[in-house]
Design a protein with these regions (language model features):
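Carbohydrate-active catalytic/glycan-binding domains of CAZyme proteins
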Residues: 1-196
């Protein structure tokens, strides 16, 4: 059990033997992040079924080559202390001096998209719900990522759970207001977007 790292010079070629960089159960949805100064970090959620608790995000510094961790793991966000229950699936970015972690919360079928931000990689992080189902038929917008194109457009790709049909992929327009992302379209004066 743990988080493993493997490398290859060609994605179709031979992969190295996996190295367990974080032994033990519990961490899920790991996301590596390389900062402008060359330092690297690993952020991840946790699964209650494997570790006994949920709704927190952990972070630890990582060797720049990804082959090991440096220092102690830290809880950087605890969704149990606010309304971000079941926060998971973090994706980390940096923009305009802000560290951002995009993470869904509330569960796959009825959840929402939350974004955390901080000027310090280890926080403290403030958060904002940036997309909810609202009046859209797209339930629980979940497990997404920011896509910034070479032409300067921003998009958000995520899935929707549609029971027997599986997980349907959606692409939402994304823009920025006051250094917070706006995903989808805002309606009725809401502070969050809805899927289009």
């Amino acid at each position: 059990e743990g988080i493993y790292m493997t490398t290859a010079t060609d994605p179709y070629g031979e992969w190295s033997k996996p190295v367990n960089i974080r032994p033990g159960a519990g961490w899920i949805d790991p996301c590596p992040f390389w900062d402008e100064d060359g330092k690297a970090y690993l952020v991840a959620g946790v699964a209650k079924s494997r570790i006994g608790y949920k709704s927190v995000l952990h972070m630890v510094e990582m060797q720049p080559d990804g082959m090991g961790l440096i220092g102690e793991e830290k809880i950087i966000f605890d969704g149990n202390l606010n309304d971000q229950i079941t926060i998971e699936g973090p994706k980390m970015y940096k923009r305009n001096g802000w560290y951002y972690i995009f993470a869904p919360a509330g569960g796959v079928k009825t959840g929402w998209q939350t974004v955390l931000r901080s000027k310090n990689v280890f926080g403290p992080y403030e958060y904002k719900v940036v997309m909810r189902q609202g009046d859209s038929p797209v339930n629980g917008p979940h497990q997404g990522a920011w896509v910034d194109t070479v032409t300067g457009q921003d998009w958000f790709i995520h899935f929707q759970d549609v029971y027997a049909a599986g997980r349907i992929t959606h692409l939402q327009p994304m823009s920025w207001e006051n250094d917070w992302p706006v995903i989808g379209v805002k309606k009725d004066g809401n502070d969050y977007g809805e899927p289009v």
